[in-house]
Amino acid sequence: VNNLDDNATYEVRVTATNHLGTSEMSKSYIASTTSVTPPSMQEYKLINRPTSENEIGTTHIVDVRNKKDENGWASQDDYLHYDSKYALVDGDFTTEWKVDNWDTGASYGADRGSEITFDDTYTIGSIGIGRTLQSGHYMGLYKVKVTYWDENDNKNVVYTESINEKWSNGNSYYMVKLNEPIRAKKIKVDTSGYGGSTQIISELKFYEYDTLSDDIKNLYEDDLRLVLKKSVTQDVLNELAKRLDTPDPISGEYHPDKDVLKKELDTAQKLFDDKEVSEKITTLDASIRTNNEGPSLGMGNSYQSLGSVARPSVDDKGTSKQIVVYMGSSDPNTRVDIVFLQNYGLPGSYMSKVQTVSPGRTEITIPSIISADVEKGGQVMARVTQGSTTANVQIRLSGVTEIPNLNVNNMINDTTKEKEVKDKIRNYISELKTYMNDINTLYPSEVSDKDKINNVYLYDEQTSPLNTTDIEGDRFTLTLPASEILKGIESGLEGNTEAQVNRVYDALLAWEQEVKVGFAKKGVFEEVQDFNGNGEIDDEDRAYFRKHRAPLTRLNIKYQRMMMGAAAYASNHHIGVGFSSSQYIQGVPYKFDENGKVTNADSAHLYGGLIGHEMGHVMDIGDRLYPETSNNLMTAITGTMLNENSPYFDSFKKVYEKVTSNTIGLSTDRTVVLNMLWQPYLAYEDNITYEMLFTDVDADLTNDSYFAKLNRAYREMSEEERVNGDRDQWLIRLSSKVVGKNLTDFYEAHGIIANETTLAYVSKFPKETKKIQYINDEARRQRIAGTADMEEVTTLSASFANGITTGSYVDSKEVKINLSVDKSNDRILGYEIYRNGEPCGFIERDKVNSQTVYTDTVENINNRVVEYKAVAYDYNLNPTNEVQLG
């Protein structure tokens, strides 16, 4: 129903008519219209201005020919509809030209665009496309095809994807920039949108080409506008400034990009006055991609910092603030995704939609990502998605606030660049201190509720987007509060710049090492090598590398809002941490001499159990996922780099209770299950943990760590290995395969029973006869040190305590047994106790007293005979003689 008044209420009744007649009126329904205000589109250099002086409705257009008109080029097109012959250019946003399809002819040969004839030949540089004012219609414009005829009626076709969506009065419209200006007497516009879209156009607006923007661009010798041409003089700059300050004589509007062009011209003036002045330029690493050949390891973040923060706002005209992205590349096929982050974001709301830019200049509206009553805004990030991985890609931004940014990518691990890296760190620390001293001046001293609506807030250390910094290495990015990073740098080292530089240098290397440990654990490689040992890198090596290639992305540690008391969380994009993050710039890597020995055992430390826990989540295997458990293997590894007790060592008492309980099913205690996953490593890994940093990344696959081999086995799992399996069965099969032993007894002790398929699979391996369910970190250390084996014919002695004798009646629920050996006491791990032929307990040796006392609590066996047996095990799990007690 057309021509209804705005903000009016109507009573609606309907009837239906068919070949049988017309029905009665329906019930009455009340419906109200809303006020629809069309967008205020640019009028600067507009050719077809609204007018009431002709039939068409706009100036300088003399004819429109539509596809389905009497004089059109087709009588049938079920997708095409238009309200009137002149709907596209009648100056009325309530009339529409509609195609019920995503393409009007820009991608395929539908040829639906209308031919619009001007009264003269015009040089056109851009086109405005007004969308339908109806809600619920998605246009998703991404490509425009322009067919035009010049003054000699020569037909030409051009395409463009330089499309900028703008918003005004609650409605969006598109401004389409042609790659080159065209001279047109007649023009035809076709569009393509993304899948699921419909192309509904209210108005087409044509704009004469204005050379001002290109004239300013042509001041420079390079696309990034860093070097002025030698022909630039002050008179040239003055003339451009005068033109920029001259409004369109008809509309009275200034150039729509006046503010941006003024900044560009101001930059040119500064460069003219001082040849050393320049704006910040960021060089992107084009090799950091998400389309990795190997496993992603859950690290999906390929974004790189542009060292800037953008904050959304709206001006007095209702126009949203934009940034301008200038991107140049040695490869014209380069494509870069631009996103905005929200500082102090929520786990599900921290990043904007992607805007893809090509080499050149792109305007992007700054989005509001969250609705919370805090300042909106955050870092602007970029990632290279297409083009050569060796391309020189550079980006410059305008409309942003620069923040301290330390980028040592492709440098931090190169020892020959240590001085260069430390110089960058020194400059960064100086910049960071100055920035934090001045940060309050970037904020007002008071704000109103109205100010907050337009995203103007007081400075708040925990929520203000400007209190942030980015630090980038080869394998990591820190996106953390600038105040906390400065605190971490200065703490205990106030006034000692060189010590602060060294602290940061070590901290960055510690992050690199943390990720390297993760890569070693996962058994991935960063470069192809001669894995098959035939003396050359061949197709077999390359195929193996592709299957086990380390991700090219980086681990991102990002300051986020924590929910429900969480200390941190993991996602594909980042590990979210809370505000207190100064410790993340204080790690110290394990340093090695020429023989691969640790030289700083007393000071080395990575980033602790919390980061290990979350990294474990990021990198965990879907086929071997034990929730909130298997991820902690990363914590165990980083906590035992020097073969210390793992952070879960104190849980072995519970492990021993489980493996001697004779119960089916895994323990409900996660630390017990974790130690079940840890024990094969303890049993079969003879290298010091840190050695995986060397053994797991070279071409020799035979000396790799247990976890590297196991993770590769999961990635290589065959259909035979997968059949009739689940998480537990695959664990039995693949861990047995990796160690070359049948481990069914070990897993059965932990409550996992092998099925028939698993039993058949592991039957090819010899049975593991040692009871590795009793091994702990200390036993592994003793084995590696060569002090695990007891002397031959070490004899166990066992007897009842408290005067109990064999065959006597015991009126107590507790039975105590004294245990000792006649020699090699310091090599005894512990004692296994049997009750009536079944294991009922395992106790570690008492390291203080000569005897170890085991207490068995006996329940519900009144008036029954109980027989005991005891066996001692050394640290290498060799048993002593058995002693019977009854």
Residue ranges of model-derived segments:
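Disordered, acidic Ser/Thr/Pro-rich linker "stalks" and the adjacent N-terminal cap
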Residues: 36-120, 132-139, 240-242
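Extracellular fibronectin type III
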Residues: 19-36, 877-886
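Beta/coil-rich, acidic/histidine-enriched accessory regions frequently appended to metallopeptidases
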Residues: 274-297, 324, 727-851, 861-878, ...
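Beta-strand-rich modules
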Residues: 4-20, 860-876
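Beta-strand-enriched, solvent-exposed domains that form extended recognition/catalytic surfaces
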Residues: 270-419, 853-856, 870-871
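Beta-rich interaction/scaffold domains
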Residues: 15-18, 41, 211-275
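Catalytic cores of extracellular degradative/oxidative enzymes
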Residues: 448-459, 463, 467-691, 695-698, ...
